[in-house]
């Protein structure tokens, strides 16, 4: 039996997104802008065969600007929350499922999208930028950890950023090499904040 591809299900995803105000499906991911400061995604993270590892991802325009300055990267994930399988017993049981027909695909996609909306309502339901950055779920690992650290700089929480960069805040995996660049740049950002009230 021929397996479906993400191209096959793109029309389904677009139709699902159209049912919910503010949502769109572009570049193989669901997205919605939060006011004019952030974007929330329900990212399927499609596999080659039609399965997904869906997750909720948050980005922020100011963090992206900071990331551009430091790393020349403009799409910095600052928070991540996996969408778990219905029968998940561990936080690592992401909602993965192979599907073979368009109807199976629609049922699966609609289900993980709906579960993603519940996560957003529970954890990211803030229109105010400061509230969102201060209350979003924290993920300290890898690239997302870097993004979280940058979000603390944007919020002028230099102490947390310093502790993360100095490895006083421990992580399971070794910290991303970009952390060294954050560490060396922190005094510059602090000085700029003291002079102008902003790090950007």
Where are the regions a protein language model picked out?
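Long, charged, glycine-rich C-terminal linkers/tails
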Residues: 26-30
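Intrinsically disordered, low-complexity regulatory regions enriched in serine/threonine/proline
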Residues: 2, 31-200
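Amphipathic alpha-helical segments
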Residues: 3-25
């Amino acid at each position: 039996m021929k397996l479906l591809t993400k191209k096959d299900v793109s029309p389904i995803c677009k139709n699902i997104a159209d049912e919910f105000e503010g949502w769109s499906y572009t570049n193989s991911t669901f997205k919605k802008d939060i006011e004019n400061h952030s974007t929330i995604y329900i990212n399927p993270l499609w596999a080659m065969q039609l399965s997904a590892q869906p997750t909720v991802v948050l980005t922020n325009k100011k963090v992206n600007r900071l990331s551009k300055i430091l790393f020349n990267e403009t799409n910095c994930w600052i928070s991540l929350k996996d969408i778990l399988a219905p029968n998940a017993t561990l936080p690592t049981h992401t909602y993965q499922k192979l599907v073979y027909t368009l109807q199976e695909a629609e049922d699966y996609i609609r289900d993980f999208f709906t579960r993603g909306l519940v996560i957003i309502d529970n954890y990211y339901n803030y229109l105010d930028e400061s509230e969102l950055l201060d209350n979003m779920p924290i993920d300290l690992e890898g690239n997302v950890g870097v993004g979280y650290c940058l979000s603390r700089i944007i919020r002028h929480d230099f102490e947390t950023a310093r502790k993360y960069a100095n490895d006083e805040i421990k992580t399971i995996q070794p910290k991303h090499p970009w952390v060294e660049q954050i560490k060396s740049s922190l005094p510059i950002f602090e000085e700029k904040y003291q002079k102008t009230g902003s790090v950007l």
